[in-house]
Amino acid sequence: NILFATCLLGAFAFSSCEKNLYDESKQSEKEIKMTDLNIPEDFQWNLTQVTKGTTIANTQTKVSLFLDEKCSKDEKVATIPVYNKAINLPLSLPTYVKTIYAQYQSKSGKMITKSVAVNANGSYTLNIPDAIEANPTRAITRDNNKKDDDYNIEDDIKYDKERGVVYHPKKGWGTIMFEDQFPSLGDYDFNDFVANYQVLFEVSKAKEKDEYESKYIAIGLCLKAVGGVFPYNPYLRLKKIKNKNIESVMMSHYKTGEEIEVNLIDNKNPKGNLIIDCTPLVQNLDRRGSKYFNTERNALVTKEEDLPEIIIEIKLKEPKEIDDILEDDEFDLYLKRNDNGTEIHMNGIEPIAYQYPFNDKNLYPIYEDGEEEDDNYYYSNERLIWGLRVPGNVAHTIEKGDFLKAYKGFAKWAQSGGKNEQNWYNQGNADDNLLIHY
C-alpha cells in the first residue's frame, strides 16, 4: 500500500423571483428548495467528461498534465511516457476545463509549460516538439515499510521511461455525496454519506495498439461524513473488471498500514463484476456523542487526520485499456442497506441485487431494451437524484444545511442542464457558515 499512500493525500444559493426562477431582477418571495428546481428532462448531472486525446513528441519523453496553469500537485491528472508516434490518451476532466497544461523538460534542460486546448467534443492534441529524451529504465526497489512524503509511485516512474500514471479525477480528491432515503426524496443536504475518492492507474503503452493500458489500480477512500440514520454500508463495483480477471486485491488502513481482510461480493452478482465490501470505512466511528458522524457543529472531527481512510490495490491478470475504465459510472461506489437490501447508486446505474421499485410513480420510468442498460435508474420524476459525484475535494453541509445556499451556483448549473456554472463547487463564493471542510 505504500506504493500509493503518499499519492493519495499528497449545493447552493438561488433566490426565488416571484414564481419565475430565472428572473433575478425581481425580489425574492420565497426560498427555493431543491424540489422546486426545474431540471431538464435529459440532464445527466455529469461534472466530468472523458476526453479523447492524442500525444506525440519529437523523442520518447515524460510529460505531466495538469488542470491549472500553475501545475499544482493536486491538480495533476497524469504523468505519462510520450513517444515519437501518436498515442491515444483518454483523460477524465471536469466539464468546465477548456485547457490542460503539459509540463516537460526541453532539450536545453528547462522545464516548459505548454497549454493544450480541449475542444468542445472532448478532443485534444498534445504535440511536444523540443523535449529531452527520457531517462533509460533502471531497476526499481520498493521499500514497503517506508511511508513519507519523499516516496511514491512517481518516484518510481521517473526512472522508468515506459511507465506512467493516470489519475481519476485527479491527484487530489474527488467527492461523492449521497441522500439515503431512496425511493423517497430526502432533505437534500447531501450529507447522509460523504466520502472522498481518488483512483490511480499505473499505465504503459499497449504492445500491439497505440493506446495506454493498466494492470495495477490503486483506490483511496476517505470518509467525510455520515448524516443519515439508516444502516447503510459502502461498496465499490468496477463495472468493466470481472472477478475472473483479478490477480489480487489488497485493502489497508492508510494511517497505520494495517492490512484489512478483503471481502469480495460473489453471490447475487450475475455479471461477475469486481465488487469490494468497503464496510471497514464506516466501522468504529467516533461520533463524539452525536448520532451522526461529522455533520453537527458540536460534534465535529477536530483534525483531518481523524477521518477514516482506506486504500485498495488491485492487480489484474491482463492489462486493460484505460479508456474502458475511466468513465465515472464504471467506478460505482454505492450504498447498500443492511436490513432490507436497498441499494443507492449514482443516477443512471442499474442496481446489482436490489429489486428496483419499477412501479413507484415518484420515480422516472425505466424502459428495458434487450440487453442494453437503461440510463434512467435513480431519477425522481422531477429528475432529482440521490447521489452526486464532484471532481474536487468539496466541503459538505452541516446537518439540515441548505445546499442551495451553501453553493450559490448549483441551482443555475442544474437548471441549465449543466451548461452554466460548471465550476459551482470551486468558485470561492460558497457560504462557509453552512459547510464543513473536513
Residue ranges and their predicted role:
Residues N1-S15:
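Sec-dependent bacterial lipoprotein signal peptides
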Residues A13-I39:
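Bacterial Sec-dependent N-terminal signal peptides
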Residues F43, P129-L185:
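Compositionally biased low-complexity segments at domain edges in trafficked proteins
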Residues L47-T51, K215-I219:
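Structural beta-strand segments of beta-rich domains
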Residues T48-E75, F190, P231-N233:
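Short, ordered, surface-exposed loop/turn motifs in non-cytosolic proteins
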Residues C71-K98, Y254-T256, E261-D266, P270:
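Tryptophan-paired
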Residues V82-A120, Y124-E133:
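Short Pro-Gly-centered beta-turn/loop motif in secreted/extracellular proteins
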Residues T279-Y438:
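A eukaryote-biased signal for long
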